[in-house]
A protein has these predicted regions:
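Generic low-polarity alpha-helical segments
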Residues: 1-2, 160
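N-terminal export signals
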Residues: 2-21
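Structured, non-membrane catalytic/scaffold regions adjacent to prosthetic-group chemistry
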Residues: 22-183
């Protein structure tokens, strides 16, 4: 039921036009990390967003073609009232935190990244969930004219992922707005 959110963390993390969060206000969560952080360069240039193409370098090369202003998140489904949040309002719903998590790709590679965001549960608690709600579904934006990878048939677009409600409400589940102190 969270629609058009799938690319928010990628595109926003690197857009000076949308730098509305004061990073001095970001709470750094103390963590015992044994591994080194993955470099900012690697985090921002080696990733899978097939919306922009099939190569690891495609998102960095093609994401600039996507219109990101204005950006809104549509929320609908098993909730009391459908809601649309402008990004600048969504990011203000809670104090931002920096959390260092290891991203593990199904392909077998991983990165240790300082993410910026807040617990997804904060947003979900602001919505009145129906007793029938079982999943939180994330659906990416579908604009093949801006996201050329969506013209391919490698996936059935738009891309959809989901979490069970208990997974989505877990305090470690992060709604991410940026990385490396950049929002």
């Amino acid at each position: 039921f969270l629609k058009k959110l799938g690319l928010a963390s990628v595109t926003l993390g690197f857009s000076p036009a949308l730098s509305f969060a004061n990073m001095a206000d970001v709470k750094k969560i103390p963590q015992n990390i044994k591994d080194n952080l993955t470099s900012y360069k690697d985090v921002t240039s080696y990733n899978n967003f097939y919306e922009f193409g099939l190569q690891k370098s495609s998102p960095k090369a093609n994401a600039h073609k996507m219109k990101i202003d204005p950006w809104a998140v549509e929320i609908s489904g098993e909730i009391e009232k459908n809601k649309t949040y402008a990004l600048e309002d969504l990011v203000k719903l809670a104090s931002l935190e920096e959390r260092i998590y290891r991203l593990r790709c199904v392909e077998g590679w991983s990165m240790v990244i300082p993410w910026v965001g807040f617990s997804l549960s904060v947003l979900l608690k602001k919505l009145t969930l129906s007793s029938r709600a079982k999943y939180v579904v994330f659906e990416t934006l579908y604009r093949p004219n801006e996201m050329e990878g969506q013209k391919s048939r490698v996936l059935d677009w738009p891309y959809i992922e989901a979490l069970r409600i208990d997974e989505a409400m877990h305090p470690l589940t992060l709604l991410c707005f940026g990385v490396y102190g950049k929002v």
